Amino acid sequence: WMLPSDPFRYASNCSDGERWQGVANCDAWPNSGEIDIMEHVGYQMNHVHATVHTKAGYWVNWEQRKGRIVAAPVDQSFNDYSLVWGPERIDAYMNGTHYFRYQKPIGADWTSWPFDHPFYLVLNVAIGGAWGRAGGPIDNSIFPVRMEIEHVRVYRHDGNRPPEVQQKVAGGSW
């Protein structure tokens, strides 16, 4: 699926007034929250980012919370991107290596921790836009391109022990 091109056209329960971003029950982005499990921009072939967007912390107010890992070129094989999300923190992994943690701020309200309500989970390959184009104009010779996802799995943590992040071993077995 694709997001609407007009940021004010999202299906939401928000009013059209200017105050919509200051209302806790408004489910429009960034109020609703977003966790980018994987963000990749083409001009940084070896870099993968995990990002948490909230009303209190997103690109408009320069308070974005993100982590980055530098790895082998990610466009040559499938990689495992893992997210461990709990009531107090969010951890991101690539191929079993931890590289980002977002800790719930002390005294957090909905503006900095909306992740106890419905929110967006995103896998993102950026071509164009302010970030994806930061390396210069888009080279049209790269098209057509595609993002392939082998699988997405969601597990519920039972709360009795820390979740385990599994790594694939040689041969593709677990």
Regions found by a protein language model. Give the residues of each.
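GH16 jelly-roll
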Residues: 1-174
